[in-house]
Amino acid sequence: MYIKQVIIQGFRSYRDQTIVDPFSSKHNVIVGRNGSGKSNFFYAIQFVLSDEFSHLRPEQRLALLHEGTGPRVISAFVEIIFDNSDNRLPIDKEEVSLRRVIGAKKDQYFLDKKMVTKNDVMNLLESAGFSRSNPYYIVKQGKINQMATAPDSQRLKLLREVAGTRVYDERKEESISLMKETEGKREKINELLKYIEERLHTLEEEKEELAQYQKWDKMRRALEYTIYNQELNETRAKLDELSAKRETSGEKSRQLRDAQQDARDKMEDIERQVRELKTKISAMKEEKEQLSAERQEQIKQRTKLELKAKDLQDELAGNSEQRKRLLKERQKLLEKIEEKQKELAETEPKFNSVKEKEERGIARLAQATQERTDLYAKQGRGSQFTSKEERDKWIKKELKSLDQAINDKKRQIAAIHKDLEDTEANKEKNLEQYNKLDQDLNEVKARVEELDRKYYEVKNKKDELQSERNYLWREENAEQQALAAKREDLEKKQQLLRAATGKAILNGIDSINKVLDHFRRKGINQHVQNGYHGIVMNNFECEPAFYTCVEVTAGNRLFYHIVDSDEVSTKILMEFNKMNLPGEVTFLPLNKLDVRDTAYPETNDAIPMISKLRYNPRFDKAFKHVFGKTLICRSMEVSTQLARAFTMDCITLEGDQVSHRGALTGGYYDTRKSRLELQKDVRKAEEELGELEAKLNENLRRNIERINNEIDQLMNQMQQIETQQRKFKASRDSTLSEMKMLKEKRQQSEKTFMPKQRSLQSLEASLHAMESTRESLKAELGTDLPSQLSLEDQKRVDALNDEIRQLQQKNRQLLNERIKLEGIITRVETYLNENLRKRLDQVEQELNELRETEGGTVLTATTSQLEAINKRVKDTMARSEDLDNSIDKTEAGIKELQKSMERWKNMEKEHMDAINHDTKELEKMTNRQGMLLKKKEECMKKIRELGSLPQEAFEKYQTLSLKQLFRKLEQCNTELKKYSHVNKKALDQFVNFSEQKEKLIKRQEELDRGYKSIMELMNVLELRKYEAIQLTFKQVSKNFSEVFQKLVPGAKATLVMKKGDVEGSQSQDEGEGSGESERGSGSQSSVPSVDQFTGVGIRVSFTGKQGEMREMQQLSGGQKSLVALALIFAIQKCDPAPFYLFDEIDQALDAQHRKAVSDMIMELAVHAQFITTTFRPELLESADKSSGKSE
């Protein structure tokens, strides 16, 4: 083992962390100038290892901290790393670090970074070979000089430290202290024995009078015992009688409380029934209000439908009359039209004949006029043209123009002909289209009527379903109110259960549920969810008669949480703490419960509690853990007997417990606050609530949902029908619009037909005139150019003039006649088209509309709706009447329940008054019992105070009455007054002092033996100390001579033990080996004393001659230092350490002696590590490793 590395920070001159290079296991030399920090390095190692720095005050710790410029150092540490490859330190590591940290308010040791105490460090170093009695493995600067100049007594002190006499001295001091304490005790015992002897002599004289006193006192105590015993027996009899009365009263009170509880249960049941009935009434009244509102709405709808049906019926009746009237009017219109058409048929041929004659006359007039014009033009061309050729040229040009004009006329005539033909064809086509549209219109009307009928059928069905849904809604509302009442009742029961349970436990249960909900939401830890089974109370059932004893037995264990394993509970608790949830939870992990089978006593007076519980066998361990060692007993007496005999907990049905350890607990238990009863009520309420919710969901809501779906389907059908209706009505309107448009087109074409015909006639007449002119011009072409008309042409002109006059006159006559006929035709046609036919169309349209209404679709649908609404009104009124009857019956039931409530209240009050009366009586009996118990205690106390009595005292006076006893007692007291001055405790004191004397004598003998043992121990210690000094002196003296000869070859040195008497009046010197023959010479006892040694002298001869031996005072400074070094080496060889630290031990030596010291260190470094500081070269030569220090 050796120092491998030193780390220093903040210590003295070392501000920053300084790591000293790894040291060699042999000789290490540190060189440096003065003030470079060599000594502080040694101080740092001493700071960790030496006792010198063991108890530092705050100011001393601050003095060790580095002081310099810059920030203040608040802590420092020195760490030494040891090479422990030889396992010299009892630590199984090759490297061991020891650090000491100091600050203004701390001083701590760390071994391998773990904090340890100073004593642990010192013990560890001692186990490695560091001796507290030999501090010379560290030699500080100046220590050599100090030893060189030290007196002999100081060297003797050093020798005693090396020999380890400190331990002997410490034990001797302890022995002296014990001896002084023992001596003091012996003196006190002697004083007490002297006092007791004197007191016993006095008490011997008082014993005679005391005998007489004791005689009468014995009689007095016997009499008093008899009196007290009789009073005690009388009191016990009264107490037994009172206990019987209390038991009877208690039984009666229990019966009254049970009756009172039954009354309260009945009242609570009645209150619950009243609440339910009131809720039912509220629901029925609310339903009645809804029915009333529905009935008002239904009556309103019925009134509307009745009015609508009446209007429709009136309309149908009126339509029948109107139809008759319209048909009659239509017939008249048809007759008039036929008459007018007949008139028109008679007039049109005349008109056509006159018109044809007129057209022919006009055509002939135009032709004759054109011919005459041509003849006059022919006559005029004689003067117009100068020559025949010029005329022919003009004629040709004119013929060309005429041909073009004739062609244009022909084209116009052909176009008009085509137009007239098209008009006629369009007229036929229009008529066909009109007939086709009329047929389509009839089909659309039939389809619309069918859709109307279907629409009203679907609507009636929808109204019926809505009425059924309204009824179901009312039912659902009633069920919802019942559900709300049940939920409120459940919340009240849960609140009562919460009030009977601790807040911390409830918070714990809620928190566990939150953790499990968190797992479920996250979908994690499924095995934890499956492994949690709820609290104990929710996992078993039992008869109500056992509720009290079961609940008292389990206590808060009812709320322990059952889990499959400790892993499940750990997972839950980890999440519980992670979520920082409140509450208190206790788990029962089934895999960790160690439950053994219990042998129950076979008796008819007790049964195992666990046999009365019903639970899942899977949780058998949990229930055996809680209830397995408890018996239900018939009475407290049975409980007490069985608890003692079978070491089991016993309990009565009333909850009175007897622990197997002997403790008794019991008293009145309020069953109204039974948590099991409350839990049963909560569970029952939850089941009823679940049944109501299931009923609501399965029946009503499912039917409502079904009806809603059907209504939605019917609404969709109605929408589809309405869409089809709109489509067909739009088609009907479009068809009517097309028919009207076709009719208007036909009338328009008829209006334009006659003008086109007249235009055609005019164009044809004009064409004939133009053709006649063209023929005339062609005939003239090539003829001679006349100057005047020929005779024939003149005749023709005259004839044409006569014809034109006749035609004009005839045409005027025809025109007048045509105008007259045309006026008749126009008037007749106007009357037909604008009056008769238009009115006929209106009549036909009204008849069509009447035919649509006469279909009865609307009236049928309205009648059907009216029947349905009447049925709903009837049903609503019937339901309302039923509700009125139910409300009356329910209110009557409430009144009956309230009467019953009053009866039970009165009964409960009577029971309460009886209980209060019994309670007062019980209090009186309790007070009396207390007084009797007090009297009993007083009697028993007085009997105890009488002390021990002879056997005859218990029987001698038993036959006497109290009066006789008191008379004898009075006589005794009179006699006892004569001995009032007697020390009544003389005998007791005599006995007491005698016993004390014996004890003190025994104690004195023990102290004498102890004193002798201490003296023997001190002699042994003194002998061992003497032997240790002698042995150490021999070893050191021998080592000193050998080391000195090696340091100074040929020289001689010896140690001399100096002696003297104890007083110090004489002294003598003893050389090496003479001490043992002189043992004990300086002591008057048989045990030699070390006090005879006065010092250790040194005698040396540097020449080796015996005659030149000199004392230390006669040596030079260098010689003294060398001798001191030799002594240190001798001490170290006597008590070797793992390593040594020398701080400038060679500063006073010359070069030759420094070389000798270096060789000595080199020799010793084979078995131990040396760390030395120097600024001389000699030590460096033998160093295995050297390093420099600089500031």
Swiss-Prot record:
Give a brief account of the tissues where this protein occurs.
Answer: Ubiquitous.
Q: Kindly list the positions annotated as binding ATP.
A: 32-39
Phosphoserine: residues carrying this PTM: 787, 886, 1013, 1065, 1067, 1074, 1083
Domain (SMC hinge) ranges: 530-642
Localization of this protein: Nucleus; Chromosome; Chromosome, Centromere
> What does the UniProt record tell us about how this protein is modified after translation?
Phosphorylated at Ser-1083 in a SPO11-dependent manner. Acetylation at Lys-105 and Lys-106 by ESCO1 is important for genome stability and S phase sister chromatid cohesion. Regulated by DSCC1, it is required for processive DNA synthesis, coupling sister chromatid cohesion establishment during S phase to DNA replication. Deacetylation by HDAC8, regulates release of the cohesin complex from chromatin.
Which InterPro entries does the protein's record reference?
P-loop_NTPase, RecF/RecN/SMC_N, SMC, SMC3_ABC_euk, SMC_hinge, SMC_hinge_sf
**SUPFAM superfamilies, alphabetized:** P-loop containing nucleoside triphosphate hydrolases, Smc hinge domain
Record-level Gene Ontology MF annotations: ATP binding; ATP hydrolysis activity; beta-tubulin binding; chromatin binding; cis-regulatory region sequence-specific DNA binding; double-stranded DNA binding; dynein complex binding; mediator complex binding
Sequence positions bearing N6-acetyllysine: 105-106, 140
Region span, Disordered: 242-268, 1059-1090
**What's one GO BP annotation on this UniProt entry?**
mitotic spindle assembly
Superkingdom per UniProt: Eukaryota
Q: List residues, modification Phosphothreonine.
A: 783
GO-annotated cellular components: basement membrane; chromatin; chromosome, centromeric region; cohesin complex; lateral element; meiotic cohesin complex; mitotic cohesin complex; mitotic spindle pole
Query: What keywords is this UniProt entry annotated with?
Result: Acetylation, ATP-binding, Cell cycle, Cell division, Centromere, Chromosome, Coiled coil, DNA damage, DNA repair, Meiosis, Mitosis, Nucleotide-binding, Nucleus, Phosphoprotein, Ubl conjugation
- Show the coiled coil region(s): 173-357, 389-504, 668-1022
Q: Which family does it belong to?
A: Belongs to the SMC family. SMC3 subfamily.
The task this protein performs is described as: Central component of cohesin, a complex required for chromosome cohesion during the cell cycle. The cohesin complex may form a large proteinaceous ring within which sister chromatids can be trapped. At anaphase, the complex is cleaved and dissociates from chromatin, allowing sister chromatids to segregate. Cohesion is coupled to DNA replication and is involved in DNA repair. The cohesin complex also plays an important role in spindle pole assembly during mitosis and in chromosomes movement.
What is the UniProt domain comment for this protein? The flexible SMC hinge domain, which separates the large intramolecular coiled coil regions, allows the heterotypic interaction with the corresponding domain of SMC1A or SMC1B, forming a V-shaped heterodimer. The two heads of the heterodimer are then connected by different ends of the cleavable RAD21 protein, forming a ring structure.
Which protein, by its recorded name, is this? Structural maintenance of chromosomes protein 3
What would be the name of the gene that encodes this protein? Answer: Smc3
